[in-house]
């Protein structure tokens, strides 16, 4: 540009506004925990144990459509979906999710047929038929029934089980939907999560459930007490909290003994705490993931 060229102030302002609006509209510029302002406690993350990080990145990114983000000064890589983050730790899992207290995690998707076709093309096993009752007709890995949901189940690396539920009305192509426990004490679990994390008690698919702003906590049946999550492929589940320190103090007053008490980690821009619920679910509480 010629140094003597004058810039029209009005055009300069329009250009500036264009850049700002483009940034705000960019998916990479938006926080992934969209529901962070809708409640004191929301769902935050799944934490995966695996010896094959690349296999899980392929599953969560290519298979399910997540995106990569970075956390804190260490720029730790995180896989992001609307209303849930996925953390990967290099460690040998003791088992998959089936047979543990948390049987699977669930997402809603606007196009289950495209998702299942993509997952099958990538070589992942669709286990829908074995997971659904005979009232569902299953074709090409997708289950349907009259007046019911269109759903599918996929088995990912290290035998992590994921459910997909079609919902064409959601705001994103895919987003967090539910955590599905398997327990002989579903009603007790519902009451416990209502008291300690503020989940609103109700039912989902006829099973005891609790609702938080961005996740349903579904407490499905099991005839026996199942394995704890810590050390398995889904090592723990995570809830994002406003004023975590205060909540930890409240939980301690209610008798919760923390596996790892409240601590702040400036390099990650986080505060965290860990406890295990009475049925063996390893739970992390965080404050700061809503900035990703």
Cite the ranges covered by each PLM segment:
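Bacterial N-terminal signal peptides
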Residues: 12-26
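Mature N-terminal segment immediately following signal peptide/propeptide cleavage
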Residues: 37-73, 77-78
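Vicinal oxygen chelate
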Residues: 31-38, 41-52, 77-78, 95-181, 202-212, 216-221, ...
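Sec/Tat-exported extracytoplasmic proteins
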Residues: 47-50, 63-68, 106-109, 123, ...
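Conserved active-site tyrosine of GNAT-family acetyltransferases
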Residues: 56-61, 119, 159, 189, ...
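N-terminal secretory signal peptides that target proteins for export/translocation
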Residues: 1-12
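Solenoidal tandem-repeat scaffolds enriched in leucines and small polar residues
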Residues: 189-190, 197-206
């Amino acid at each position: 540009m010629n140094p003597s060229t004058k810039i029209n102030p009005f055009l300069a302002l329009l250009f500036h506004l264009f850049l700002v609006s483009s940034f705000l509209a960019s998916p990479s510029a938006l926080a992934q925990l969209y529901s962070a302002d809708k409640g004191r406690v929301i769902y935050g993350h799944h934490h995966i144990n695996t010896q094959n990080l690349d296999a899980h990145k392929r599953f969560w990114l290519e298979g399910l459509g997540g995106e990569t983000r970075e956390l804190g000064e260490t720029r730790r890589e995180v896989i992001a979906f609307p209303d849930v983050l996925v953390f990967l730790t290099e460690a040998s899992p003791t088992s998959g999710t089936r047979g543990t207290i948390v049987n699977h995690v669930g997402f809603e998707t606007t196009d289950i047929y495209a998702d299942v076709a993509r997952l099958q093309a990538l070589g992942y096993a669709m286990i829908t038929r074995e997971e659904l009752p005979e009232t569902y007709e299953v074709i090409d890995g997708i289950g349907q029934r009259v007046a019911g949901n269109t759903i599918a189940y996929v088995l990912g690396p290290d035998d992590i089980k994921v459910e997909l539920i079609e919902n064409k009305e959601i705001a994103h192509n895919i987003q967090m939907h539910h955590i599905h426990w398997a327990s002989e004490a579903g009603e007790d679990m519902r009451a416990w999560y209502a008291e300690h994390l503020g989940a609103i008690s109700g039912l989902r698919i006829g099973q005891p459930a609790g609702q938080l702003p961005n996740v349903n906590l579904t407490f499905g049946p099991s005839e026996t007490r199942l394995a704890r999550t810590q050390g398995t492929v889904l090592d723990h589940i995570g809830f994002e909290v406003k004023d975590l320190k205060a909540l930890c103090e409240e939980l301690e007053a209610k008798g919760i003994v923390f596996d790892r008490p409240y601590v702040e980690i400036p390099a990650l821009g986080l505060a965290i705490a860990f406890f295990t619920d009475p049925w063996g679910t390893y739970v992390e509480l965080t404050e700061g993931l809503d900035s990703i």
